[in-house]
């Protein structure tokens, strides 16, 4: 058995072990189709060695340092201008610092839509609430840069589902909520987007956040909208459409 969280050099190759002493990296690259544990979180990789999911219980760890090199290198050739190296699980929540917990993420998503949820989770953990956190990362084709990230977290039994779109000028998330909000709310949102387009602005729907009660009933939906031309970001919260 190998020691946990160690580097081993064997025949000019460097191997790294996770919290259980299992090898999960070769020459600093994640191995394909494995499950590894770092800082109490379990992660999986797909057949190309890309992070595909995570789950665990966040802890409040404000003293954790970042790995700036891993953040700068995330995504390799598929990284785009304006990307951050975004932690899937924030360092302050016990997420590890290296590329085993980092993907290229639009800066507006990482510092806005995603950060808002991290702050909510951190506050709940600080207050001693029971928090579970999991997520899925989606990719287009062979790209190493995610197209979307879905995060599901429960705070004292109340579920929230965040979806972020990592693609500029995308409206893919519209189909995830257009059936859930009142018709006039949807029409007003579409009119607002049309007005921005008529003004010559590019627009993205960057995120949706669905909030549920303890019985699993959908209560509200928050939509993140970005004017890509002037950089203005707005968040709009809608109540669930009434039955009938």
Functional labels for PLM-detected ranges:
Residues 1-28, 33:
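Long, low-complexity, intrinsically disordered regions
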Residues 26-243:
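Domain-level detector of nuclease and nuclease-like folds
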């Amino acid at each position: 058995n190998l020691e946990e969280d160690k580097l081993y050099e064997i025949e000019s190759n460097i191997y790294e072990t996770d919290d259980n002493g299992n090898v999960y990296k070769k020459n600093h690259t994640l191995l394909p189709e494995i499950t590894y544990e770092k800082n109490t979180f379990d992660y999986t990789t797909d057949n190309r060695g890309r992070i595909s999911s995570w789950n665990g219980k966040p802890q409040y760890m404000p003293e954790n340092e970042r790995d700036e090199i891993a953040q700068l290198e995330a995504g390799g050739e598929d990284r785009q201008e304006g990307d951050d190296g975004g932690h899937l699980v924030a360092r302050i929540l016990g997420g590890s610092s290296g590329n085993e917990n980092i993907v290229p993420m639009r800066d507006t998503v990482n510092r806005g839509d995603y950060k808002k949820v991290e702050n909510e989770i951190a506050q709940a953990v600080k207050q001693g609430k029971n928090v579970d956190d999991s997520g899925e990362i989606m990719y287009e084709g062979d790209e190493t840069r995610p197209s979307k990230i879905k995060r599901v977290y429960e705070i004292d039994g109340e579920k929230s589902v965040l979806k972020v779109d990592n693609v500029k000028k995308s409206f893919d998330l519209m189909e995830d909520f257009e059936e859930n909000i009142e018709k006039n709310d949807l029409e007003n949102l579409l009119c607002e987007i049309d007005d921005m387009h008529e003004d010559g602005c590019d627009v993205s729907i960057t995120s949706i956040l669905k909030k549920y009660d303890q019985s699993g009933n959908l209560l509200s939906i928050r939509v993140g909208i970005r004017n890509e031309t002037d950089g203005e970001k707005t968040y709009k919260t809608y109540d669930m459409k009434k039955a009938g």
